[in-house]
Amino acid sequence: MELLRTITYQPAAGTKMCEQALGKACGGDSKKKRPQQPSEDGQSQAQVTPAAPHHHHHHSHSGPEISRIIVDPTTGKRYCRGKVLGKGGFAKCYEMTDLTNNKVYAAKIIPHSRVAKPHQREKIDKEIELHRILHHKHVVQFYHYFEDKENIYILLEYCSRRSMAHILKARKVLTEPEVRYYLRQIVSGLKYLHEQEILHRDLKLGNFFINEAMELKVGDFGLAARLEPLEHRRRTICGTPNYLSPEVLNKQGHGCESDIWALGCVMYTMLLGRPPFETTNLKETYRCIREARYTMPSSLLAPAKHLIASMLSKNPEDRPSLDDIIRHDFFLQGFTPDRLSSSCCHTVPDFHLSSPAKNFFKKAAAALFGGKKDKARYNDTHNKVSKEDEDIYKLRHDLKKTSITQQPSKHRTDEELQPPPTTFAKSGTSAVENKQQIGDAIRMIVRGTLGSCSSSSECLEDSTMGSVADTVARVLRGCLENMPEADCIPKEQLSTSFQWVTKWVDYSNKYGFGYQLSDHTVGVLFNNGAHMSLLPDKKTVHYYAELGQCSVFPATDAPEQFISQVTVLKYFSHYMEENLMDGGDLPSVTDIRRPRLYLLQWLKSDKALMMLFNDGTFQVNFYHDHTKIIICNQNEEYLLTYINEDRISTTFRLTTLLMSGCSLELKHRMEYALNMLLQRCN
């Protein structure tokens, strides 16, 4: 059965006035009755022509005229019926106002005469049973259902801006940012349905309803069904013919993948203004669907084409999951607005960033993170390179310097070197437990730095530790200064592998600072500025007296001058293995193509521990709640990982934060991390 199957908007409520006393509460009007308009978008289950809109001609459809005042026989509540919102196979949908509190609902009214046969009534009962248990921000809310002698009434969430079908009818096509905005919400609602083991089975523009705040709600559960194991799946063909998947047409049953297929059709239709499998006759349409044959216009950008093609894969197993869809480059590489103006219902939105700083950073983001290979790309349209473009190019050039040496460490007095008593820290836990808010002033306690720089002048000029720190600081500051305000962490979640510190020990009052990486490499930055790593095989040692000068030897056969340090290294390794737990849920993956990580500098304040590595990886662990921030560079793109108090990690592109903003809890930590980086030499 079809819930809000089609939305036919009637400008004037076309029926008798309520009693005079109730006129205002009802919002009725006294204009003459108008003839019913044909349905605009959704097709009924029995529809046969996919290309043309289907007109229902059931003039006896609703039986006798439905009364303006409707009373719930069980509660005695009185409702006033308003204008028709839409109509479908069995029912009409009306605006309906609860006269006790003036709350407006969308009421689906089904005459008993339309569901007289047992199988018809079963459909209604099944729809009610499925829909009434659903509660999600992006699913039309079911409120109440009752019956009287004439009709069944289902009270649903009222969506004042009608459906996506109406928006597309007015707009013809939508922009990519809008499509991302709506698709995110559809995916969110659909993911919830699939988690409840419910298949929608009729996803289309006419079943996505838009409320006053321009939020999308998935509706119409008339064809919805519980997810069955493959062997028990229904083989019936249902749904709107254009959006039927090959496996449903071939009577192999409907699974989650069939909803993904429909989502691909929806995305295609939003971007191009027509469905992918629209032909002049039904037989040809079905042939195209079975062969997954459709045209992909060159006007679409590559990520959009790729995502549509993956969702419209002929083989259901080749289609992406809902999580894969949200992690696709179409979402990750493009701007998604946080909210849309209601003017988008009829007018193309303007997403132009007005502030020059934001424009600069948007271009910088494209240069830094978009994988642009050379400066020439920016000179295509300008004979002369603008100052802004030069700044961007310089910024990108700085980011590519990942082989780092560092500035000579300062000689410190014994007093400065004396840290607090020995502190063994469990995965970022410290003896310092500070409950205060993270603030601007950084109170340094102790630090350690890798030994003096090599004699090469190029090393001093290009690859000093200062260069690494400055580059990370510049990118972090650029993101913080230009990202919009937001109240939550972006939805993006990348699955990527990188090295980070899972355990650490500060024994700097005697030997130095030890840490374990996620690939189980153990490193120690000794108080004398030397660095030693024990590789995951526990057999090989890498020794750095100075940056870029690495000695490699077996752990069991160390040169005489290193024996005592190797003993300390093994002690750190054993201690962390036995006593400390991992500080997060990130997978431990080793990528042998990536350079070995070693620590350039570590620094402890009264609130956090900062670690800066040779390849620009930057990690800050906060003591009081064990949250962590990790910034790393992969394929000329900066990623930020946030590990929350529950040790659950989320990874974003910095460009995503730049465009979407983030929660205050993350922003405050990013600001503190930046201050630690800037004040590291103080």
From Swiss-Prot:
The active site is at residue 202. Catalytic activity is enhanced by phosphorylation of Thr-236. ATP binds at residues 85-93, 108. The modification Phosphothreonine is found at residue 236. Residues 36-48 have a biased composition (Polar residues). Residues 500-578, 598-682 form the POLO box domain. Changing residue 108 to M: Loss of kinase activity. GO terms for cellular component: centriole; centrosome; chromatin; cytoplasm; dendrite; kinetochore; nucleus; postsynapse. One of its GO terms (molecular function) is ATP-dependent protein binding. Changing residue 202 to A: Loss of kinase activity. Residues 79-331 form the Protein kinase domain. Changing residue 504 to A: Abolishes interaction with SIPA1L1. Residues 25-67, 402-430 are annotated as: Disordered. Activated by phosphorylation of Thr-236. Once activated, activity is stimulated by binding target proteins. Disulfide bonds: none annotated. Its EC number is 2.7.11.21. Keywords: ATP-binding, Cell projection, Cytoplasm, Cytoskeleton, Kinase, Nucleotide-binding, Phosphoprotein, Repeat, Serine/threonine-protein kinase, Transferase, Tumor suppressor. The POLO box domains act as phosphopeptide-binding module that recognizes and binds serine-[phosphothreonine/phosphoserine]-(proline/X) motifs. PLK2 recognizes and binds docking proteins that are already phosphorylated on these motifs, and then phosphorylates them. Tumor suppressor serine/threonine-protein kinase involved in synaptic plasticity, centriole duplication and G1/S phase transition. Polo-like kinases act by binding and phosphorylating proteins that are already phosphorylated on a specific motif recognized by the POLO box domains. Phosphorylates CPAP, NPM1, RAPGEF2, RASGRF1, SNCA, SIPA1L1 and SYNGAP1. Belongs to the protein kinase superfamily. Ser/Thr protein kinase family. CDC5/Polo subfamily. This is Serine/threonine-protein kinase PLK2. It comes from Rattus norvegicus (Rat).
